[in-house]
């Protein structure tokens, strides 16, 4: 979870406007307050929060988003997005986004290598997502293998490349 905070900090230092959306499960790993302090923006978790500025906040957020980066992305989030399930603030917002999307899966090696997870990542690729391969090494569960979230500076390079080299002429 600390890597997401470091990535957020690096983006803010580059004067990016960063808005963080977290799942309820993500808040068990790192407090939303961490990201609020780093970005100066309210972290969005609850789709039905009555303190939003806009009546339909996930649509307003999707409309003003230039790039989506989901890091780390659990197998659950990958599956939801691959199959169009929108049952929380993250998935409803992202499904409404028309901007470029990056996703960095991070999970246990066996979960990552599971054919179902690989199929879901292939679906996301077909829908235009850039899937960032996980790093290998010692995982949070103690196992060693593929499944680690890449280092923040590596994730930042994907973001900068996407911003610097838009794919407007892709396929032409």
Where are these regions (language model features)?
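A cross-family phosphate/adenosyl-ligand binding-site feature
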Residues: 1-102, 109-171
